[in-house]
């Protein structure tokens, strides 16, 4: 049905307002989406931008699954629970911001490795698999970075099998982490 609605929209080239609670349907059928919270518009954007660059915690949590990671912006770095990253790695998202900041990072934008990745341009942290669930198309993992109270959701292809309790390396790419308002 999603593709038929989109086809009709494109064929007749008309403006339509379509109200739905089905996120997948909204992403397929829309040129722009308005996300509302308690009767107030939180963000209006194209589906790709809304999903990949949400502006607020509400929008990030409403559209798809995400991990919220609390941090503190200092002069030249961003300090997380157990690790720090140079502020310049965040593509200018933090320009002019200091103090507490919350990041959103989608589960599919975190990678898992059985050994420390070599030559990675991202950030690699030691961690441990806390839980896992096989869902056919992918593994759904809960991982804990070492020396941190964080728990991160990570989805990985079915061929990437890690056991609960196994030590792993967690790959984060700062450019895939969105600073929220």
Predicted segments, located by residue:
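ABC ATPase nucleotide-binding domains
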Residues: 1-58
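A short, acidic, flexible beta-alpha connecting loop/helix-capping segment that sits on the rim
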Residues: 157-160, 173-177
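ATPase nucleotide-binding modules
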Residues: 55-103, 107-128, 137, 142-161
């Amino acid at each position: 049905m999603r593709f038929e609605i989109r086809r009709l929209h494109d064929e007749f080239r008309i403006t339509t307002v379509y109200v739905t609670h089905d996120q997948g349907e909204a992403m397929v059928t829309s040129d722009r989406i308005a996300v509302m919270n308690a009767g107030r518009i939180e963000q209006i954007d194209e589906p790709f931008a809304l999903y990949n660059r949400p502006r607020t915690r509400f929008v990030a949590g409403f559209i798809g699954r995400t991990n919220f990671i609390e941090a503190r912006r200092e002069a030249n770095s961003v300090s997380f629970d157990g690790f720090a990253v140079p502020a310049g790695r965040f593509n200018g998202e933090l320009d002019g911001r200091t103090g507490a900041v919350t990041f959103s990072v989608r589960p599919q934008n975190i990678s898992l490795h059985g050994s420390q990745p070599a030559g990675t341009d991202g950030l690699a942290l030691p961690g441990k698999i806390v839980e896992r669930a096989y869902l056919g198309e992918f593994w759904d993992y809960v991982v804990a970075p070492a020396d941190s109270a964080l728990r991160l959701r990570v989805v990985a292809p079915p061929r990437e099998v890690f056991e609960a309790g196994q030590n792993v390396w967690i790959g984060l790419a700062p450019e895939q982490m969105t600073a929220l308002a």
